[in-house]
Amino acid sequence: MHYPSLYTFAAPDHWRAAPLFTTSCEAFLASFKVWNSATAGGNICMSLPAGPMITMTVALEATYTLWAADGSERTVDAADFVTGNHENILGPGEILRRVNIPISALRKRHTHRRFTLTQLGRSTLFMIATQSADMTDLLLTVTAGTTKPVRFSFDSMPDAETLQQSIDAIPEAVWFDDPNGTPDHRRHLAKHYAEEIRIELSAGVRS
Protein backbone atom coordinates (compact mmCIF):
# COMPACT_ATOMS: atom_id res chain seq x y z
CA MET A 1 0.00 0.00 0.00
CA HIS A 2 1.28 3.47 -0.91
CA TYR A 3 1.66 6.07 1.82
CA PRO A 4 -1.10 8.41 0.53
CA SER A 5 -3.61 5.53 0.58
CA LEU A 6 -2.68 4.55 4.12
CA TYR A 7 -2.61 8.17 5.27
CA THR A 8 -6.16 8.84 4.07
CA PHE A 9 -7.58 5.40 4.90
CA ALA A 10 -11.04 5.67 6.47
CA ALA A 11 -11.07 3.04 9.19
CA PRO A 12 -14.17 1.79 11.02
CA ASP A 13 -14.92 3.63 14.25
CA HIS A 14 -14.22 0.58 16.40
CA TRP A 15 -10.62 0.45 15.16
CA ARG A 16 -9.45 2.67 17.99
CA ALA A 17 -5.79 2.29 17.07
CA ALA A 18 -6.29 3.26 13.41
CA PRO A 19 -5.01 6.83 13.98
CA LEU A 20 -1.59 5.20 14.21
CA PHE A 21 -1.75 4.80 10.42
CA THR A 22 -1.66 8.56 10.03
CA THR A 23 0.83 9.07 12.85
CA SER A 24 3.25 6.60 11.30
CA CYS A 25 2.91 8.07 7.81
CA GLU A 26 3.72 11.50 9.23
CA ALA A 27 6.91 10.05 10.74
CA PHE A 28 8.19 9.11 7.28
CA LEU A 29 10.88 11.60 6.28
CA ALA A 30 11.05 11.98 2.49
CA SER A 31 10.55 14.39 -0.36
CA PHE A 32 7.03 14.98 -1.69
CA LYS A 33 7.78 12.82 -4.73
CA VAL A 34 9.16 9.92 -2.71
CA TRP A 35 6.42 10.16 -0.05
CA ASN A 36 3.74 9.84 -2.73
CA SER A 37 5.32 6.80 -4.37
CA ALA A 38 6.79 4.94 -1.40
CA THR A 39 5.06 1.84 -0.03
CA ALA A 40 4.62 0.43 3.44
CA GLY A 41 6.22 -2.83 2.33
CA GLY A 42 9.23 -1.06 0.92
CA ASN A 43 9.76 0.80 4.17
CA ILE A 44 9.60 -2.47 6.09
CA CYS A 45 12.03 -4.26 3.78
CA MET A 46 14.56 -1.42 3.90
CA SER A 47 14.72 -2.28 7.60
CA LEU A 48 16.17 1.03 8.73
CA PRO A 49 15.92 1.90 12.46
CA ALA A 50 13.63 4.87 11.79
CA GLY A 51 11.25 2.98 9.50
CA PRO A 52 7.79 4.06 10.75
CA MET A 53 5.96 1.16 9.09
CA ILE A 54 8.11 -1.17 11.14
CA THR A 55 7.14 0.73 14.28
CA MET A 56 3.45 0.63 13.44
CA THR A 57 3.23 -3.02 12.44
CA VAL A 58 5.26 -4.28 15.40
CA ALA A 59 3.15 -2.19 17.79
CA LEU A 60 -0.05 -3.53 16.21
CA GLU A 61 1.10 -7.14 16.56
CA ALA A 62 1.21 -7.74 12.82
CA THR A 63 2.50 -10.79 11.03
CA TYR A 64 4.28 -10.78 7.68
CA THR A 65 3.77 -13.37 4.97
CA LEU A 66 7.03 -13.97 3.09
CA TRP A 67 6.99 -15.53 -0.37
CA ALA A 68 9.98 -17.50 -1.65
CA ALA A 69 11.04 -17.94 -5.27
CA ASP A 70 9.84 -21.56 -5.24
CA GLY A 71 6.30 -20.44 -4.31
CA SER A 72 6.47 -21.48 -0.68
CA GLU A 73 5.32 -19.13 2.06
CA ARG A 74 6.14 -18.55 5.70
CA THR A 75 4.56 -16.28 8.28
CA VAL A 76 6.64 -14.42 10.84
CA ASP A 77 5.95 -12.03 13.70
CA ALA A 78 6.67 -8.45 12.64
CA ALA A 79 8.82 -8.10 15.75
CA ASP A 80 11.18 -10.80 14.45
CA PHE A 81 11.62 -9.53 10.88
CA VAL A 82 14.21 -6.77 11.35
CA THR A 83 17.45 -8.07 12.85
CA GLY A 84 19.63 -4.95 12.70
CA ASN A 85 20.33 -1.70 10.89
CA HIS A 86 19.31 -2.39 7.27
CA GLU A 87 19.16 -6.12 8.05
CA ASN A 88 16.26 -8.58 8.07
CA ILE A 89 15.42 -12.26 7.74
CA LEU A 90 14.54 -12.23 4.02
CA GLY A 91 16.31 -15.01 2.16
CA PRO A 92 17.62 -14.79 -1.43
CA GLY A 93 14.70 -14.19 -3.80
CA GLU A 94 12.21 -13.90 -0.93
CA ILE A 95 9.72 -11.03 -0.83
CA LEU A 96 7.25 -9.55 1.62
CA ARG A 97 3.87 -10.52 0.23
CA ARG A 98 1.38 -9.55 2.91
CA VAL A 99 1.08 -7.68 6.21
CA ASN A 100 -1.72 -8.85 8.48
CA ILE A 101 -2.80 -6.73 11.44
CA PRO A 102 -5.22 -8.49 13.81
CA ILE A 103 -8.52 -6.77 14.51
CA SER A 104 -7.92 -7.31 18.23
CA ALA A 105 -4.89 -5.01 18.05
CA LEU A 106 -6.78 -2.35 16.11
CA ARG A 107 -9.43 -2.24 18.83
CA LYS A 108 -6.92 -1.33 21.53
CA ARG A 109 -6.30 2.00 23.19
CA HIS A 110 -3.05 3.60 22.14
CA THR A 111 -0.59 6.41 22.67
CA HIS A 112 2.78 7.28 21.23
CA ARG A 113 5.86 9.41 21.74
CA ARG A 114 8.31 10.57 19.07
CA PHE A 115 11.44 12.69 19.32
CA THR A 116 13.25 14.44 16.47
CA LEU A 117 16.06 16.97 16.50
CA THR A 118 14.14 19.21 14.10
CA GLN A 119 10.44 19.62 13.40
CA LEU A 120 10.53 17.55 10.21
CA GLY A 121 13.60 15.52 11.06
CA ARG A 122 14.27 11.82 11.20
CA SER A 123 13.05 10.05 14.32
CA THR A 124 15.60 9.80 17.10
CA LEU A 125 13.11 7.66 19.02
CA PHE A 126 9.61 6.44 18.17
CA MET A 127 7.55 4.58 20.79
CA ILE A 128 4.01 3.24 20.57
CA ALA A 129 2.00 1.71 23.41
CA THR A 130 -1.28 -0.16 23.17
CA GLN A 131 -3.62 -1.43 25.85
CA SER A 132 -6.68 -3.66 25.87
CA ALA A 133 -10.10 -2.17 26.56
CA ASP A 134 -10.04 -3.36 30.17
CA MET A 135 -7.01 -1.09 30.71
CA THR A 136 -4.90 -3.61 32.59
CA ASP A 137 -2.12 -4.75 30.24
CA LEU A 138 0.59 -2.85 28.34
CA LEU A 139 2.35 -3.50 25.05
CA LEU A 140 5.22 -1.07 24.53
CA THR A 141 7.27 -0.86 21.33
CA VAL A 142 10.58 0.99 21.09
CA THR A 143 12.04 1.83 17.67
CA ALA A 144 14.18 4.36 15.78
CA GLY A 145 16.53 4.58 18.76
CA THR A 146 17.31 0.90 18.41
CA THR A 147 18.80 -1.06 15.50
CA LYS A 148 15.80 -3.38 15.60
CA PRO A 149 12.35 -3.10 17.19
CA VAL A 150 12.05 -3.91 20.88
CA ARG A 151 8.61 -4.83 22.16
CA PHE A 152 7.70 -5.31 25.81
CA SER A 153 4.54 -7.16 26.81
CA PHE A 154 3.14 -6.83 30.33
CA ASP A 155 0.04 -8.73 31.44
CA SER A 156 -0.63 -5.99 33.97
CA MET A 157 0.50 -2.38 34.12
CA PRO A 158 4.07 -2.39 35.46
CA ASP A 159 5.20 -0.06 38.19
CA ALA A 160 7.72 2.66 37.38
CA GLU A 161 10.74 0.68 38.57
CA THR A 162 9.85 -2.42 36.56
CA LEU A 163 9.36 -0.39 33.41
CA GLN A 164 12.66 1.47 33.86
CA GLN A 165 14.47 -1.81 34.45
CA SER A 166 13.00 -3.21 31.24
CA ILE A 167 14.40 -0.28 29.25
CA ASP A 168 17.76 -0.65 30.98
CA ALA A 169 17.80 -4.33 30.02
CA ILE A 170 17.96 -3.52 26.30
CA PRO A 171 21.49 -4.59 25.30
CA GLU A 172 23.96 -1.78 24.66
CA ALA A 173 24.64 -3.08 21.15
CA VAL A 174 20.96 -2.69 20.22
CA TRP A 175 20.89 1.07 20.82
CA PHE A 176 21.47 2.99 17.58
CA ASP A 177 24.27 5.53 17.29
CA ASP A 178 24.17 8.16 14.55
CA PRO A 179 24.11 11.98 14.21
CA ASN A 180 20.48 12.01 15.39
CA GLY A 181 21.35 10.68 18.82
CA THR A 182 23.79 8.72 20.94
CA PRO A 183 22.80 5.46 22.64
CA ASP A 184 22.80 7.19 26.04
CA HIS A 185 20.56 9.97 24.76
CA ARG A 186 18.14 7.51 23.21
CA ARG A 187 18.04 5.37 26.34
CA HIS A 188 17.29 8.47 28.43
CA LEU A 189 14.45 9.44 26.08
CA ALA A 190 13.03 5.92 26.14
CA LYS A 191 12.93 5.83 29.94
CA HIS A 192 11.41 9.31 30.11
CA TYR A 193 8.70 8.57 27.54
CA ALA A 194 8.00 5.12 28.96
CA GLU A 195 7.09 6.67 32.30
CA GLU A 196 4.93 9.30 30.60
CA ILE A 197 3.11 6.53 28.76
CA ARG A 198 2.68 4.47 31.92
CA ILE A 199 1.14 7.42 33.75
CA GLU A 200 -1.12 8.32 30.83
CA LEU A 201 -2.53 4.84 30.34
CA SER A 202 -2.75 4.15 34.08
CA ALA A 203 -4.93 7.24 34.41
CA GLY A 204 -7.45 5.69 32.06
CA VAL A 205 -7.22 8.45 29.46
CA ARG A 206 -9.32 7.22 26.59
CA SER A 207 -7.71 7.00 23.18
Q: Locations of the language-model features?
A:
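C-terminal structural segment of proteins
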Residues: 1-207
